[in-house]
């Protein structure tokens, strides 16, 4: 059985955790302390005295690359490379023998096992009081306190297949939480099935510090691959449970610090939000399902795990990158033709991705692009950049130059309007609605890219800069810019991509800022402006340049920012926290 206390002790020894004994408030104060520590690549934080709760709070468990590597040492040893080799090799005794340790790991560790305790490791509340939990309010305009690391377990009413996902939950009262289910993800699909049958959906929520459980809950696994099974494989041992929950028959995992059991109520919705999310903006108030908590279990010395999300880099960035690192050897097996793939956490992962693919025949790259956009959570990608060249996808400027040199505007630019969109992304015409853009750059270069702008001043543009060769960045505003007029500037045709932004200095300060400001503030169908060359056989052919309007639109939610009062309060107490 995993022990969070042992993990805390280990991180102390490694000087990767600091104990804070100064009393702190879960309303804004903890979040602001956490953000400052994350910004300085600091340690995990254990707050021992939290106002209004008997439970300590643990945050920033995953806040640096170093700490993530410490928490998952075995996953950096190439275990998924071995899986890829085994699965791609013709079956033979020698191959099986060579990978016998991997097979043994799979046979011995997969699944769950019941573990007997006397007494039980959990205390049980028949009349649960969620007000005792030190739920955090992270941003000043958040709608209330939230569970930010809930591991939400459901089973399909149709076939019983389980799902473990992470969906934020807003506390409404002693027994009720808002459940931010998204229809594109497993828990939301299960709730849809339950409502079709006019049934409540049994839901079990684990609050656990087990890094493998957390990693598994956010992993972009193929549909119907159980996350608990994946977790047991990652940690190389079965998950233990004490018993099955009343009514739902869900396993009560020993690795949890807190377990909430209850139901998502069919046909019932309640306004949830706002919430400062991992895109760095507030997701707005919308009606979402209601979770009614019927039982609350917790360890006697329970530690409440939490995270704070916001503008990158936060903990989710490092976890997401670790997942991509360990799963990357499997991409060519799951999606033949895809040699490398990266979603950019700098823009919240779903906004922009890139892939290196094979182009062995005409438009094979397009086939691979469509396959990527049909795969699980990757289907939420807005901007997808594709090349067949050997390029380091971690270097986005190099990737962008590689594509722009090769992209033929009459056939390599595909815009798909009216698609589903990430629920947290407000760049589309309505909630859950958006578009996709595929940008292909394969074969030999067809153009040289300019590296410096040497043209005249542009109407409505206050400053001009260059992100990388071929990508011009213009500082302007919604009120000043006239995009149709800009497209008539013939000297701009040599620049394949032109991005409109409010703040040139911030956008060009580093790659993270460019990715975040460009792709979280735009949608392919509504914000790409490209001259049309002609239309043939229902295919639109374009010509350069393409102007991407990444300006903040009036309909967009606000960027998250801490309030001045909280900043001053935390600054005045900073030395006390760490004395």
Swiss-Prot record:
Q: What are its GO cellular component terms?
A: cytoplasm
One annotated GO molecular function is: carboxy-lyase activity
Enumerate the Pfam families for this protein: UbiD, UbiD_C, UbiD_N
Q: Which InterPro entries match?
A: HBDC, UbiD, UbiD-like_C, UbiD-like_N, UbiD_Rift_dom
Q: Can you tell me which family this protein belongs to?
A: Belongs to the UbiD family.
NCBIfam families, sorted: mena_SCO4490, UbiD family decarboxylase
Listed name of the protein: Uncharacterized protein TC_0359
Species the sequence originates in:
Chlamydia muridarum (strain MoPn / Nigg)
